[in-house]
A protein has these predicted regions:
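Short glycine/proline- and aromatic-enriched beta-strand/turn motifs that initiate or cap beta-hairpins
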Residues: 27-91
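Transmembrane beta-strands of outer-membrane beta-barrel pores
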Residues: 52-58, 78-80, 87-91, 110-112, ...
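Transmembrane beta-strands of outer-membrane beta-barrel proteins
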Residues: 46-50, 72, 81-85, 104, ...
C-alpha cells in the first residue's frame, strides 16, 4: 500500500480478501490482505502460520522492493468471532524508511443459508517507521460475503468492500472493492490443488493526495490468478500479479520502476497445529 503514502510525501500495508470458504481462499492466497480464519463451531481454536514469499505484493504493488519476505501469523477463532496478528518485513526504499509491518485484525463471520459474511476491522502498523511527514499506520473496515456455487461443485466466490477514513500516507478516504474466486481441482498425487484469483479496484481522491500517476488519476485496478498446492499442513502457491498502472514512477503509488507491473510470485507456508 505504500505507493499511496508516497503521493502524500511527493505501497502497503498488508488483506484481507473476503474470507472464502474454499480451502485455498481460506489460506489467504489471491487477495489483498491477510485472510480471516474459517470458524469451526463454538470452540476456541488457535493456529500459527509461518511462511515466506519471493515478493510481498499487496493489491498489486510490491511491498518489499521486489525482494523476498518472511511472514507469520497467529489466529484465534471462537464460534463466529475471529482475531489475529500478522507480520512481515517490508522495504519502501526509504520512501519512507520502514522495516516491518504488523497487522492486527478482528471480526465476525455469521452465516445465512449458504452465504458466509465477513465483517471486520484491520489495523496496519509500521513500528519504528520514519514517517513523520505522512503517517503510515491506518485503520480499515471491511464487509464482504462468500458462498459455494450451487451449480459448479468446488467453486467458491465472493466480494469484499474495504474502507478507510484516512488511508496510509495521510491521503484521505479510500475504498477498495475486491472480488475473488477459488476452484478446487481433483486430487493430484499427494497434493490438493486449487485455482484462485482476485480482481479489485482502489478508489481515492486526488484532492486529498491519493494519486496513481502524479496527476488527477485517483483509482487503479489490480488482479491475480494462481495455483495453490496443499499437502498436509503445507501450502505452495504460484501466482501471477498485474495492475493497470504500468511503469508510472514519481510522486504517485510507485516509487520505482517495476513495483506496480506484472510479476510472478512464489509463496510457501505451514500452518500449525
Amino acid at each position: 500500500m505504500w505507493g499511496f503514502r508516497n503521493s502524500a510525501l511527493t505501497l502497503l500495508a498488508g488483506v484481507s480478501l473476503v474470507s472464502l470458504s474454499g480451502a485455498a481462499l481460506a489460506d489467504g492466497y489471491g487477495g489483498s490482505v491477510k485472510d480471516a480464519p474459517i470458524a469451526e463451531g463454538r470452540k476456541l481454536d488457535l493456529s500459527v502460520t509461518l511462511g515466506g514469499t519471493s515478493d510481498y505484493v499487496f493489491r498489486g504493488i510490491s511491498q518489499t522492493f521486489e525482494n523476498p519476505a518472511a511472514q507469520g501469523s497467529v489466529d484465534l477463532t471462537y464460534g463466529i468471532f475471529y482475531a489475529g496478528i500478522w507480520a512481515s518485513n517490508v522495504d519502501f526504499d526509504d520512501n519512507p524508511k520502514a522495516n516491518a509491518e504488523i497487522d492486527l485484525y478482528a471480526g465476525l463471520k455469521p452465516t445465512w443459508g449458504p452465504v458466509t459474511f465477513d465483517l471486520g476491522v484491520l489495523y496496519y502498523a509500521y513500528p519504528s517507521a520514519k514517517d513523520s511527514a505522512a503517517e503510515l499506520d491506518y485503520v480499515e473496515l471491511k464487509a464482504g460475503y462468500s458462498m459455494a456455487s450451487p451449480w459448479i461443485k468446488g467453486l467458491t466466490s465472493g466480494t469484499t468492500l474495504y474502507w478507510s477514513s484516512e488511508y496510509g500516507g495521510d491521503v484521505g478516504e479510500v475504498f477498495t472493492l475486491e472480488s475473488a474466486a477459488a476452484y478446487e481441482l481433483p486430487q493430484f498425487g499427494i497434493f490438493s490443488p486449487s485455482i484462485t484469483g482476485a480482481y479489485g479496484t482502489v478508489y481515492g481522491d486526488w484532492k486529498e493526495g491519493f494519486s496513481v500517476d502524479g496527476t488527477r488519476e485517483d483509482e487503479y485496478t489490480y488482479w491475480n490468478v494462481g495455483l495453490a498446492l496443499a499437502v498436509e499442513k503445507f501450502t505452495f502457491d504460484f501466482r501471477y500479479w498485474d495492475t493497470d498502472i504500468g511503469n508510472v514512477v514519481g510522486p504517485a503509488v510507485c516509487v520505482s520502476e517495476g513495483l506496480c507491473d506484472e510479476r510472478f510470485v512464489f509463496t510457501a507456508k505451514v500452518t500449525l497445529p
